[in-house]
Amino acid sequence: MDPFGSSSVPPCSTSDLPEPKLYFVRLSPHAVPPVRATHGAAGYDLFSAYDIKVPARGRALVPTDLVFQFPPGCYGRIAPRSGLAAKFFIDVGAGVIDPDYRGNVSVVLFNFSESSFNIRRGDRVAQLILERIMVPELSELTQLGETDRGASGFGSTGMGAVDRNQRSVLEWLTPGSR
């Protein structure tokens, strides 16, 4: 039994609004329509439209041959697939697809391994997650309100909780500390 009441993620909508739709166009016969792998998946899997080699310690741009039109008030975020990273050291470059973009959506893949990695046409390479946009009016100030944290960053909130047997993020980022 699911303690939160549901084992799936429903589409983001409210009863007083029409059901949102994600429209897409295939630019070639190689384009694979986006798919949610499970009913509870947050994103739509994106597939490579071509065979592409990602060089060792390099990167490659992988076209999906898909063009999208997002529901009003949403944009698309390109997110990694955990399996590619865990098994093959392949990561996805962050990507934002603006709602007014009408070009071929491509995915930047980074290969952190010592061997080249072959992507085949039809391979899942990333996921597309739709997120709502907030675009507030800008207001410049001469100074902002104070907080307890202030300008402390890069691991500062975890400094008191770091186990002495573990290295903190700052130790890994600071040259000569290892």
Swiss-Prot record:
Domain of life: Viruses
Spans traversing the lipid bilayer: none
Names of required cofactors: Mg(2+)
Pathway the protein takes part in: Pyrimidine metabolism; dUMP biosynthesis; dUMP from dCTP (dUTP route): step 2/2
UniProt EC number: 3.6.1.23
Keyword Metal-binding belongs to the record: yes
InterPro entries linked: dUTPase (IPR008181), dUTPase-like (IPR029054), dUTPase-like_sf (IPR036157), dUTPase_trimeric (IPR033704)
Catalytic activity: dUTP + H2O = dUMP + diphosphate + H(+)
An example Gene Ontology molecular-function term: dUTP diphosphatase activity
GO biological process, one term: dUTP catabolic process
UniProt entry keywords in alphabetical sequence: Hydrolase, Magnesium, Metal-binding, Nucleotide metabolism
Top EC class for this record: hydrolase
Pfam families referenced in this protein's UniProt entry, alphabetically: dUTPase
Function: This enzyme is involved in nucleotide metabolism: it produces dUMP, the immediate precursor of thymidine nucleotides and it decreases the intracellular concentration of dUTP so that uracil cannot be incorporated into DNA.
Family of the protein in this entry: Belongs to the dUTPase family.
Descriptive protein name: Deoxyuridine 5'-triphosphate nucleotidohydrolase
Annotated source species: Fowl adenovirus A serotype 1 (strain CELO / Phelps) (FAdV-1)
